[in-house]
């Protein structure tokens, strides 16, 4: 387990609060839900959902694939996929208020609430998975990634972002190598991409096979 304490105060206070808090995350994101899109996209130049969505479309060209959007939030990533013809999308997020906004966008077949520090119990396994913005400084940690990857059927694909600043500050590459070895999934690619442009934060986009 990585016990480093990076200085997240160098970021916008809204991000710093999210990056430093490990307790009551559901409440935190419930309180942020109403302004989340404008804060991130308009104020901070958030592009993670676009860059990850573009990688996803390369990896999963079949628009009839069953897709789980993990940490779907208000639906930014799901909406981007839907705009490119993907229709079989379910969403899951920690925050009920975020899910309410996503529901109003009429993107998802089903919406579920879950904390991925625990295993996700589902009656089905998905053909593919997109997870944008969940793995960063706080929780869930890289050591919880198997809970995400296990949602996808063998032979499927996972496209998962990791906050690039956290990747460097916390040496998350080493944690990922340990997690993939421990749980037997393959990291096929690690792609450098955008994340939050106005904050100078990039991302690592992981392409993973269960």
Where are these regions (language model features)?
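A short SAM/SAH-binding and catalytic strip from SAM-dependent methyltransferases
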Residues: 127-141
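Class I SAM-dependent methyltransferase SAM/SAH-binding core
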Residues: 68-120
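Conserved SAM-binding loop and adjacent beta-strand
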Residues: 38-53
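Conserved Class I S-adenosyl-L-methionine
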Residues: 171-191
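Core SAM-dependent methyltransferase catalytic element
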Residues: 196-210
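Conserved beta-strand signature within the Rossmann-like core of class I S-adenosyl-L-methionine
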Residues: 155-163
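N-terminal, positively charged/glycine-rich alpha-helical extensions of SAM-dependent methyltransferases
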Residues: 1-35
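A short glycine-rich, Lys/Arg-flanked "PGG" loop and its adjoining helix->strand segment in the class I
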Residues: 143-154
């Amino acid at each position: 387990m990585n016990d480093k304490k990076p200085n997240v105060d160098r970021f916008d206070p809204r991000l710093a609060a999210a990056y430093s808090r490990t307790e009551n995350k559901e409440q935190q994101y419930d309180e942020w839900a109403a302004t989340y899109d404008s804060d991130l996209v308009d104020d901070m130049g958030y592009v993670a959902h676009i860059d990850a969505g573009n990688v996803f479309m390369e990896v999963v060209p079949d628009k009839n694939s069953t897709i789980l959007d993990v940490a779907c939030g208000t639906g930014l990533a799901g909406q981007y996929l839907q705009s490119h013809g993907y229709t079989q999308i379910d969403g899951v997020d920690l925050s009920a208020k975020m899910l309410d906004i996503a529901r109003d966008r009429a993107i998802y077949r089903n919406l579920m609430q879950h904390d991925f520090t625990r295993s996700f119990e589902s009656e089905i396994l998905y053909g593919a998975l997109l997870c944008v913005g969940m793995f960063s400084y706080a929780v869930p940690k890289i050591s919880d990634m198997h809970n995400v990857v296990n949602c996808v059927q063998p032979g499927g694909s996972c496209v998962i972002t990791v906050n690039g600043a956290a990747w460097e500050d916390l040496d998350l590459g080493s944690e990922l190598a340990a997690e993939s070895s421990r749980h037997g999934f393959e990291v096929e690619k690690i792609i450098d991409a955008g994340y939050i442009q106005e904050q100078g934060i990039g991302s690592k986009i992981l392409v993973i096979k269960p």
